[in-house]
């Protein structure tokens, strides 16, 4: 084993455990994303139907099946826990780190360098932020990272058979990616591969091997696609036109954002390595003739970034697949700078981390001091959260200082800057944000009342899925707003699962004769209860969330 490699292997393992595993159970689930995916898998396991996704008992056609299956396995192994909900994301991120290690080892045959590349990947702010959060992006990123690795193997292959196997692996990865999140898994590899083929004049061969990969991707998806089409003929219409065309290209696309949206996301997501980012990208371009693998990695960063920037709909999680090739570029550039004793690069990176941590500390103090009333998000009694936040970013400052020099591998200790943030972020979040965005705590406080209610309703899909998850029931009704369940509510066999404001008083007068009714509302900040609601027997409110409890009436009061 190379000198120092054992130390970095141990540090990598400790970092993964502390950052990706230890905090999972202690953090409350966020709505709408985490509660949505938790409840979909809970309903799949409860019903035994792994083919047709349902949310609150309604058809839910926004994504294919593989991501749900991975989440199902997490809950099957670890039960109805927050750890189980997030396990698939962490597992996928861990496998992506293994792919980063494998690619680095394949290219350079340097064990220490490969371990550092994996550590850099796991420490990127965007990676550990999304990788410990229950969404499908870490899973699609895993398959796209596998496709990227297969592309590296194909580029380095010196025999036709080896190259063909690599392209088949790329096709398999794309097929599994399509099963996870759809056509994105086909588009991203295609646009990343194209400039490499053009620059190295391999277009004809690439098209041939690409056709082979595409055929395998189709064969991987054909069985479940046909089976789901037979069970739910409307799935492909909704999934293709609504989820892909409208989300990415239509004028009314979801999550619209300007073209430059991903530039600040990439900058912040690259912390604590932002100081190395420009040099790493430039080095990837300069090395295109002597190190084609680095140019390939550059294409896997830049081309998807451009594609997502052009798309009308944008979310910060979309560029997660760019981070594995970026980590490889950062590791290679960092090693070059360390070998050449170019300490100014590491000084700059440490300076950026220092400035970021100081700004975060100042922002925390301002948010709790009341000096800026419009920016105050902490109440008077929440000073312990501010103290914890200050300690978190003080830790960021300490590791930034340690990483300032290129001596040995000290520069790589910048990876530990976000360690305390990952461990303690749940203790920093203000209560008003917890109540509106992490309703588990509020629901558990009134769990007895909710469990005793014959009917439970909510005006927000995220809160409704949190109710369903905590109470283990899929019959939560929607009040007023339909949200992302609008399509599923159109089916004739689920009529009565949504109540408008006008219909609710009449429905309540009838149904509370059969049992208690609980209505959980998510309100805007400083919003009063909506007008026109029948008077509740009990009202429990905390910031943006309110529970209205209507007790059962005896039949004689009809």
UniProtKB/Swiss-Prot annotation:
Record's InterPro entries? ArnT_tfrase, Glyco_trans_39/83, LipidA_mod_glycosyltrf_83
How this chain sits in the membrane, per its record, is: Multi-pass membrane protein
Which terms does the UniProt entry file under GO BP? lipid A biosynthetic process; lipopolysaccharide biosynthetic process; protein O-linked glycosylation; response to iron(III) ion
Q: In which pathway does it act?
A: Lipopolysaccharide metabolism; 4-amino-4-deoxy-beta-L-arabinose-lipid A biosynthesis
* This enzyme's EC code(s): 2.4.2.43
Q: Which GO terms describe its molecular function?
A: 4-amino-4-deoxy-L-arabinose transferase activity; mannosyltransferase activity
Keyword tags: Cell inner membrane, Cell membrane, Glycosyltransferase, Lipid A biosynthesis, Lipid biosynthesis, Lipid metabolism, Lipopolysaccharide biosynthesis, Membrane, Transferase, Transmembrane, Transmembrane helix
Reactions performed catalytically: 4-amino-4-deoxy-alpha-L-arabinopyranosyl di-trans,octa-cis-undecaprenyl phosphate + lipid IVA = lipid IIA + di-trans,octa-cis-undecaprenyl phosphate
Q: Name one GO cellular component term.
A: plasma membrane
Q: What does this protein do?
A: Catalyzes the transfer of the L-Ara4N moiety of the glycolipid undecaprenyl phosphate-alpha-L-Ara4N to lipid A. The modified arabinose is attached to lipid A and is required for resistance to polymyxin and cationic antimicrobial peptides.
Q: Which HAMAP family match?
A: ArnT_transfer
**Membrane-crossing segments per the record:** 4-24, 87-107, 115-135, 136-156, 178-198, 207-227, 257-277, 295-315, 316-336, 355-375, 383-403, 411-431
As for subcellular location, the record says: Cell inner membrane
Q: Which organism is it from?
A: Sodalis glossinidius (strain morsitans)
UniProt keyword annotation of Nucleotidyltransferase present: no
Q: Which family does it belong to?
A: Belongs to the glycosyltransferase 83 family.
Q: What is the protein's given name?
A: Undecaprenyl phosphate-alpha-4-amino-4-deoxy-L-arabinose arabinosyl transferase 1
């Amino acid at each position: 084993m190379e000198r120092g490699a054992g130390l970095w292997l141990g540090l990598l393992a400790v970092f993964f455990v502390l950052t990706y595993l230890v905090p999972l159970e202690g953090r409350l689930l966020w709505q709408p994303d985490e509660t949505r995916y938790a409840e979909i898998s809970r309903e799949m396991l409860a019903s035994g139907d792994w083919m047709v996704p349902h949310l609150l008992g309604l058809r839910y056609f926004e994504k294919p099946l593989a991501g749900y299956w991975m989440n199902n396995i997490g809950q099957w192994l670890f039960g109805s826990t927050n750890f189980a909900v997030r396990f698939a994301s962490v597992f996928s991120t861990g496998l992506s780190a293994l792919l980063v290690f494998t690619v680095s080892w394949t290219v350079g045959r340097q064990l220490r360098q490969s371990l550092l590349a994996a550590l850099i990947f796991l420490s990127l702010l965007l990676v550990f932020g999304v990788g410990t959060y229950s969404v499908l992006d870490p899973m699609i990123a895993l398959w796209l990272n596998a496709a990227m690795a297969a592309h590296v193997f194909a580029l380095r292959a010196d025999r036709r058979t080896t190259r063909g196997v690599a392209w088949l692996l790329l096709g398999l990865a794309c097929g599994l990616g399509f099963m996870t999140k759809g056509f994105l898994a086909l588009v991203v590899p295609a646009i990343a591969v194209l400039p490499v083929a053009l620059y190295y004049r391999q277009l004809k061969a690439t098209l041939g091997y690409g056709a082979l990969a595409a055929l395998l991707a189709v064969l991987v998806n054909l069985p479940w696609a046909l089976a789901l089409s037979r069970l739910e003929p409307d799935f492909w219409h909704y999934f293709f036109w609504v989820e892909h065309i409208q989300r990415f290209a239509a004028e009314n696309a979801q999550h619209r954002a300007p073209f430059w949206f991903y530039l600040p996301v990439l900058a912040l997501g690259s912390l604590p390595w932002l100081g190395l980012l420009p040099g790493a990208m430039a080095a990837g371009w300069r090395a295109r003739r002597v190190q084609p693998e680095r140019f390939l990695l550059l294409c896997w960063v830049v081309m998807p970034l451009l594609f997502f920037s052009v798309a009308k709909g944008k979310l910060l999680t979309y560029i997660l697949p760019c981070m594995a090739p970026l980590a490889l570029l950062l590791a290679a550039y960092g090693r070059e700078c360390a070998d050449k004793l170019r300490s100014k690069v590491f000084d700059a990176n440490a300076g950026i981390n220092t400035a970021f941590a100081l700004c975060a500390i100042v922002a925390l103090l301002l948010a709790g001091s009341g000096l800026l009333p419009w920016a105050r998000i902490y109440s008077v009694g929440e000073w312990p959260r501010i103290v914890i936040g200050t300690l978190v970013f003080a830790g960021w400052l300490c590791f930034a200082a340690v990483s300032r020099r290129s001596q040995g591998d000290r520069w790589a200790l910048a990876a530990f800057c976000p360690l305390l943030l990952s461990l303690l972020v749940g203790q920093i979040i203000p209560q008003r944000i917890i109540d509106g965005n992490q309703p588990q705590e509020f629901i558990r406080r009134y769990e007895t009342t909710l469990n005793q209610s014959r009917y439970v309703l909510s005006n927000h899909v995220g809160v409704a899925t949190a109710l369903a998850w905590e109470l283990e029931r899929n019959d939560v009704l929607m009040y007023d707003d339909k949200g992302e369940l609008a399509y599923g509510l159109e089916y004739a066999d689920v009529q009565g699962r949504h109540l408008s404001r006008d219909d609710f008083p009449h429905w309540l007068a009838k149904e509370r004769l059969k049992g208690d009714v609980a209505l959980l509302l998510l309100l805007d900040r400083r919003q009063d209860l909506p007008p026109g609601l029948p008077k509740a027997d009990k009202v429990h409110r905390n910031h943006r969330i309110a529970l209205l409890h209507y007790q059962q009436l005896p039949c004689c009061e009809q």
